[in-house]
UniProtKB/Swiss-Prot annotation:
Pfam families: Asp_decarbox (PF02261). It is found in: Cytoplasm. The keyword Membrane does not apply. InterPro entries: Asp_de-COase-like_dom_sf, Asp_decarbox. One of its GO terms (molecular function) is aspartate 1-decarboxylase activity. This is Aspartate 1-decarboxylase.
Length: 131
């Protein structure tokens, strides 16, 4: 049996742009994709923290070091510039692989620069976890 598990996550990144007249996807700074172990063109789930929208798209690598998070095409209607989003990619594992699996969780600062990468998310308030 296969189990779907969190593979990589970019937590509370700020939407820098939303481009409606663009072929669909989300453009993400390549530094963030690599830190989270997410590939270009990989299917991802996006959750908008500000409005609660959840949707799926795929990634396009953005320029390194820019902090770029840009929703493109129809996905641009699901967010507003300045919103905080959570971007997640998943993988399917065999049951015997689940016990040893650890996702990559990337926390970013206000400029979408990598602040911390961990393989563990403890339950708690953001202020308690990040500081």
């Amino acid at each position: 049996m296969k189990v779907t598990m969190l593979k990589g996550k970019i937590h509370r990144a700020k939407v820098e742009q939303a481009e409606l007249d663009y072929v669909g996807s989300i453009t993400v700074d390549m530094d963030l994709l690599e830190a989270a172990g997410i590939y270009e063109y990989e299917k991802v789930q996006i959750v908008d923290v500000n409005n609660g929208n959840r949707f799926e798209t795929y990634t396009i690598a953005g320029e390194r070091g820019t902090g770029m998070i840009c929703l493109n095409g129809a996905a641009a209607r699901c967010v507003s510039t300045g919103d905080k989003i959570i971007l997640m990619a998943y993988c399917e594992l065999n049951e015997n692989e689940v016990k040893d699996h650890r996702p990559k969780v990337v926390f970013v600062d206000d400029n979408n620069k990598v602040e911390r990468v961990t393989s563990y998310e403890k339950h708690g308030r953001l202020s308690d976890i990040i500081l």
